[in-house]
Amino acid sequence: MKLTILLLVAALLVLTQARTERRRVKSRKTSSTYDDEMATFCWSYWNEFQYSYPYTYVQPCLTLGKACTTNSDCCSKYCNTKMCKINWEG
């Protein structure tokens, strides 16, 4: 009887741990994809308007619903990502 209970508890622990790990991996994938999309979005905006509106990151950030009060590099978190640098360098 005790052995059965121990086996059940062990099985539950294994299942719980596997579930947690799956959730952790899933959230990591989601944020990575989001960051890549954001980097591409910000880079495209910068590339298109760099001659007429240099350093203007306000518009894309407002489009994304981010509060942005100054003209400072609002999207620098995304524009400094690896994907954005690859795009920028060609």
UniProtKB/Swiss-Prot annotation:
Entry note about domains: The presence of a 'disulfide through disulfide knot' structurally defines this protein as a knottin.
UniProt signal peptide: 1-18
Organism of origin: Conus imperialis
Record keywords: Amidation, Cleavage on pair of basic residues, Disulfide bond, Knottin, Neurotoxin, Secreted, Signal, Toxin
Family: Belongs to the conotoxin O2 superfamily.
GO molecular function, one term: toxin activity
Protein name, UniProt field: Conotoxin Im6.2
GO CC list: extracellular region
UniProt KW Secreted keyword: yes
Subcellular location: Secreted
Annotated tissue distribution: Expressed by the venom duct.
